[in-house]
UniProtKB/Swiss-Prot annotation:
Subunit structure: Monomer. Binds 30S ribosomal subunits, but not 50S ribosomal subunits or 70S ribosomes.
GO biological process, one term: maturation of SSU-rRNA
InterPro entries named in the record: KH_dom-like_a/b (IPR015946), RbfA (IPR000238), RbfA_dom_sf (IPR023799), Ribosome-bd_factorA_CS (IPR020053)
Gene: rbfA
Superkingdom in the source lineage: Bacteria
Region (Disordered): 124-162
NCBIfam families on file: rbfA
Keywords noted in UniProt: Cytoplasm, Ribosome biogenesis
Record's protein name: Ribosome-binding factor A
Family, per entry: Belongs to the RbfA family.
Pfam short name (any one): RBFA
């Protein structure tokens, strides 16, 4: 019987082990700037997907996603060994590394929201100078303070007849 709470605990532990191993133990220059973001473990505890993101050397540099993916593939065996030693489970999960695209999605959503705000501002600018096409209320009878009913009469008997 799958235990989702156990899978979450194992994912959290794998996340910690892999992140600290990349930072302190594995000396691959391709892993510089790699940050482990999240880990998901299947319910049967046999597969773990580790999500990572890559930062550039400076703010202006584009991250090297290809080098980071290649370095993670090279280090996959050593990382799995460390996960097995650090978790103490009967079967060490297979590690799969996937680039986290959340930041790309956030940037895209920010761009779409900025475009929507600009379109709203243009519409408000156009709307501010607009006037109704005709009278303000073309159905109102002039001179009379009371509006006629559906049949043209003035009174409280405007209820539908059944």
């Amino acid at each position: 019987m799958p235990d989702p709470a156990r899978a979450r605990r194992l994912a959290k532990r794998i996340n910690t082990i892999v992140a600290s191993a990349i930072e302190f133990e594995i000396k691959d220059p391709g892993l510089d700037g790699v940050t482990i973001v999240d880990t998901k473990v299947t319910a049967d505890l046999h597969d773990a997907t580790v999500f990572y993101t890559v930062m550039g050397r400076t703010l202006d540099d584009e991250p090297d996603y290809g080098a980071a993916a290649a370095a993670l593939e090279r280090a996959k065996g050593a990382l799995r060994t460390m996960v097995g030693a650090g978790t103490g489970v009967r079967f060490t999960p297979t590690l799969t590394f996937t680039r986290d695209t959340t930041s790309d999605s956030v940037a895209r959503m920010d761009e779409l929201l900025a475009r929507a705000r600009a379109a709203d501002a243009d519409l408000a600018r156009v709307r501010s100078g607009a006037k109704p096409a005709g009278e303000a209320d073309p159905y109102r009878e002039s001179g009379s303070g009371v509006e006629p009913g559906r049949d043209g009469s003035i009174g409280d008997d405007d209820q539908p007849e059944y």
